[in-house]
Curated annotation (Swiss-Prot):
It comes from Prochlorococcus marinus (strain SARG / CCMP1375 / SS120). Keywords: ATP synthesis, ATP-binding, CF(1), Hydrogen ion transport, Ion transport, Membrane, Nucleotide-binding, Thylakoid, Translocase, Transport. GO terms for molecular function: ATP binding; ATP hydrolysis activity; proton-transporting ATP synthase activity, rotational mechanism. This is ATP synthase subunit beta. Belongs to the ATPase alpha/beta chains family. PANTHER family: ATP SYNTHASE, ATP SYNTHASE SUBUNIT BETA, MITOCHONDRIAL. It is found in: Cellular thylakoid membrane. It catalyses: ATP + H2O + 4 H(+)(in) = ADP + phosphate + 5 H(+)(out). It comes from the Bacteria. It is a peripheral membrane protein. The keyword rRNA processing does not apply. Produces ATP from ADP in the presence of a proton gradient across the membrane. The catalytic sites are hosted primarily by the beta subunits.
Length: 488
């Protein structure tokens, strides 16, 4: 039974109309439920089938009727069935007991691991933190991943858009971030699967168990809670599951005073579900068929993701761009809320450079001298200009070869190739299939390392020494090993 139903007011209504996932319920005069209240319908239909579902009130229609959207399939639901107003919004379990578990939009566990060992629940609809409670000073969230920390740093309590096709390393990057926030920041993570494939959710769960992010033997040692409303679910579930995941994250931030990572995969599906619900409720569509409340819907979710004086929720959101059209209202509205973008490039993955984060396409509002400091800013811009020059020279190299370049350009190419290799690093969660121990690289080590490459101090070291290492000390050790092996 849904957690929301535990606070039942007992006001009973009758289902009068069912159109797909939308139902109209009639209540006694003066006892209408509030908008966003959860209604619970349980019982047997005339055919003897068990029916149990929760719906959320969306509209008050007049004539003592409300219109609600179901959070699960309405198969078997018939007119005349009894609906109970729970008196509150949908509520989900929160706290440490959620770690290592998989929930649906209603906070019910769906992983066959038994009931959740907590009585603490929280409603999924809440106000965003007050302005006076916010942490206003921008602070960089160190991930320990060189390419991100140097070129597109994340803001603590900020929102990051994650762009990338299939098979370029999104899942491994997500796992590494979850691992690093747990080990280095003492934080936890919440994963919200919004309208994506069930198979992907299952694969992710199995990979989390393999990499130790979820400890199957002792769930209390797990570092992530998962909340799924996948492609096969009704639009109501897909529209609200992001809020369910966010509510779990808010508890860790506000009550446990922790730094939290919230992953949303995929934020576009949240908008898409809102569009479907809007049409079902009979609202006039807006541009490209989206809901007229698009900006409000996205804003209500995004404004709750922030840093407070107590803790922070840093959100990483996979963004699907329909037909690669960045001007589509859904991605365009999302972009307005993002502080950074991390773009994964197939060309880098093909070269074996992991993480395959594109150093030229990825951006961050944090990369400015007033926030990260002059040295970090100068180093990042020098790295980008070196890589950009290398990109411009690639056509000439392909046609005429390296020998036709000027001395300066040859030096630039040599350093750019070392930079490109040095942007790769071994991940902790990938140890099981690379056989290499993972590396967490401190920001100061990252900056110092790239400065040494740019200054020419390391021009005499072989390019291969920079590949899949942590800091510059490891580069030098690897170079000595390569040199020793060559002499044998």
């Amino acid at each position: 039974m849904a957690a929301a139903a535990t606070a039942s007011t007992g006001t009973k209504g009758v289902v009068r109309q069912v159109i797909g996932p939308v139902l109209d319920v009639e209540f006694p005069a003066g006892k209408l439920p509030k908008i966003l209240n959860a209604l619970r319908i349980e019982g047997k239909n005339p055919a003897g089938q068990d029916v149990a579902l929760t719906a959320e009130v969306q509209q008050l229609l007049g004539d003592h009727r409300v219109r609600a959207v179901a959070m699960s399939g309405t198969d078997g639901l018939v007119r005349g069935m009894e609906a109970i107003d729970t008196g509150s919004a949908i509520s989900v379990p929160v706290g440490e007991a959620t770690l290592g578990r998989i929930f649906n939009v209603l906070g019910e566990p769906v992983d066959e691991q038994g009931p959740v060992k907590t009585k603490t629940t929280s409603p999924i609809h809440r106000e965003a933190p007050k302005l006076t409670d916010l942490e206003t000073k921008p602070k960089v969230f160190e991930t320990g991943i060189k390419v991100i920390d140097l070129l597109a740093p994340y803001r603590q309590g900020g929102k990051v858009g994650l762009f990338g096709g299939a098979g370029v390393g999104k899942t491994v990057l997500i796992q590494e971030l979850i691992n690093n926030i747990a080990k280095e920041h003492g934080g936890v993570s919440v994963f919200g699967g919004v309208g994506e494939r069930t198979r992907e959710g299952n694969d992710l769960y199995e990979e989390f168990k393999e990499s130790g992010v979820i400890n199957a033997d002792d769930l209390t040692q797990s570092k992530v809670a998962l909340c799924f409303g996948q492609m096969n679910e009704p639009p109501g579930a897909r529209m609200r599951v992001g809020l369910s995941a966010l509510t779990m994250a808010e508890h860790f931030r506000d009550v446990n005073k922790q730094d939290v990572l919230l992953f949303v995969d995929n934020i576009f599906r949240f908008v898409q579900a809102g569009s479907e619900v809007s049409a079902l409720l009979g609202r006039m569509p807006s541009a490209v068929g989206y809901q007229p409340t698009l900006g409000t819907d996205v804003g209500e979710l995004q404004e709750r993701i922030t840093s407070t004086l107590e803790g922070s929720i840093t959100s990483i959101q996979a963004v699907y761009v329909p037909a690669d059209d960045l001007t589509d209202p859904a991605p365009a509205t999302t972009f307005a809320h993002l502080d950074a973008t991390t773009v994964l490039a197939r060309a880098l993955a093909a070269k074996g450079i992991y993480p395959a984060v594109d150093p030229l396409d990825s951006t961050s509002t944090m990369l400015q001298p007033s926030v990260v400091g002059d040295e970090h800013y100068r180093t990042a811009r020098a790295v980008q200009s070196t890589l950009q020059r290398y990109k411009e020279l690639q056509d000439i190299i392909a046609i005429l070869g390296l020998d036709e370049l000027s001395e300066d350009d040859r030096r630039t190419v040599d350093r750019a190739r070392k930079i490109e290799k040095f942007l790769s690093q071994p991940f902790f969660v990938a140890e099981i299939f690379t056989g290499m121990s993972g590396k967490y690289v401190k920001l100061e080590d990252t900056i110092a390392g790239f400065n040494m490459i740019l200054s020419g101090e390391l021009d005499d070291l072989p390019e291969q020494a920079f590949y899949l290492v942590g800091n510059i000390t490891e580069v030098k050790e690897k170079a000595q090993k390569i040199s020793a092996d060559a002499k044998k």
